[in-house]
Amino acid sequence: MVILKNDKLTVSIEEFRAEIKSVKTGDGTEYMWQGGGEYWEGTAPNLFPIVGRLCDGYYTIDGVKYELGMHGLSYGGNFKVIEATQDRAVFELTDSEESLKSYPFKFSFKVRYTLTDSLITVDYIVENRDDKTMYYSLGAHPGFNVPLAKGGNFAQYYFEFEEEAKPIGYELTADGLITGKKEPFSLICDTILPLTGQEIFVPTVFLEDMSTKVTLKSNKTRRSVTMTYEGFKYLALWHDDNSPFICIEPWTGTPELIGNSRELKDKNGITALDKGKTDEYTYTIEIK
């Protein structure tokens, strides 16, 4: 376990999946969902080179079939620590003989964590090390405890978006695939989304044209989590039915669109990266 620590926060990160496992304040309050039990086992996985699920678990490149599990290679792990200090850690996932069987590109996917006061900055660095154009999507999947404070309950919490927005909601199947149906998604005063009373909420809300800053909060406590995600086109909000956590997931792409071409380059929200080039993305988590 890699530990980042200052007088405000202690952040514990597992090497294998470069995954935040714990974020604690100075008084010992845990903000991250701890996984396990009857609910989701993860805490904050990183998603690459796809987000979500593929139809029938495969895609094609020039007609050749490749099988790849939900959320891609990084969800399965095998990262290595390449830098670790008291306030910064960098993890890297690279291609291997095994990965080339399901994703035929030579690549580097780095996840860099930087701790500054009560702010965690997460950078994704994608490098195409191949001699051809590489296609990918990526995203974050952090899960936070709800309630954040003792004595509270899930129904007291809501999302407050910094900017007014009129997002588009995607209809998803029970397996998390996109049906192709989209419609306006209502927010209270264009900024507020309660965690309860939304039939569409369970299990996932998937939004486009969303504000790029959101706070998970309650009027019953001063504790909150704020995320920014400039450069991520989509936002997924996921919650296991009756579970005591919520995931805030900025993504650059989408799950598979039913009936779409199976070619990876035609996948909804896919990014094309030329040979030898690098892309970078950043999101932040602020703990209060």
Language model: regions and residue ranges:
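Active-site pocket scaffolds in enzymes
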Residues: 223-288
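Acidic, contiguous internal or C-terminal segments within carbohydrate-active enzymes
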Residues: 4, 95-148
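Active-site/ligand-binding surface loops and adjacent short beta/alpha elements
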Residues: 146-229
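Hydrophobic residues positioned within well-ordered beta-strands of beta-sheet architectures
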Residues: 89-91, 109-111, 122, 138-140, ...
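Beta-strand-rich interaction surfaces with strong enrichment in secreted/lumenal proteins
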Residues: 110-112, 203, 268-273
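Extended, loop-rich substrate-binding clefts of extracytoplasmic carbohydrate-active enzymes
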Residues: 64, 69-117
